[in-house]
């Protein structure tokens, strides 16, 4: 499975926790996850994710528009293949599958990292893994769903850092 992350920055080249080396490593982690867990249809040989960095004001606007929640958040995901019930339902016969968009606010990620006693890089990897899991149908509205999602994202973060 080949995973490609297309990166964009709405902040005009502001400082970022993210770098090209991280992109390659997270693509591998996501590819490994897909190979092991098989969440995509058999026909899918590659997948694509759009990753965009937004400033706090931009993220607050997006959060308000789509979640009706005030203020910025660390990560938002917009799944391409979510059906009306919220389940992941991609086309079964596509060999290349765009999964959707992940929008990250590095400033909020850095604040959360400091509050949680983590490195900014570790927190960035965590929110991107979290966003990816939303793209393939995971949610955390219920405790059981939350536990399953958190276990997977923590496993992916550990793989990223070689733990």
Language model segments and positions:
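An acidic/histidine-cluster motif and surrounding catalytic segment
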Residues: 1-125, 133-163
């Amino acid at each position: 499975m080949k995973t490609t992350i297309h990166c964009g920055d709405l902040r005009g080249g502001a400082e970022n926790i993210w770098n090209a080396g991280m992109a390659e490593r997270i693509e591998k982690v996501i590819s490994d996850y897909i190979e092991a867990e098989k969440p995509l249809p058999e026909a899918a040989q590659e997948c694509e994710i759009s990753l965009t960095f937004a400033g706090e004001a931009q993220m607050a606007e997006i959060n308000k528009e789509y979640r009706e929640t005030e203020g910025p958040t660390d990560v938002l995901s917009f799944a391409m293949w979510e059906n009306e019930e919220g389940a992941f339902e991609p086309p079964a016969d596509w060999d290349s599958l765009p999964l959707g968009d992940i929008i990250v606010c590095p400033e909020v990620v850095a604040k959360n990292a400091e509050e949680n006693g983590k490195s900014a890089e570790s927190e960035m990897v965590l929110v991107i893994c979290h966003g990816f899991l939303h793209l393939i149908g995971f949610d955390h509205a219920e405790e059981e769903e939350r536990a399953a999602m958190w276990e997977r994202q923590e496993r992916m973060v550990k793989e990223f850092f070689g733990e």
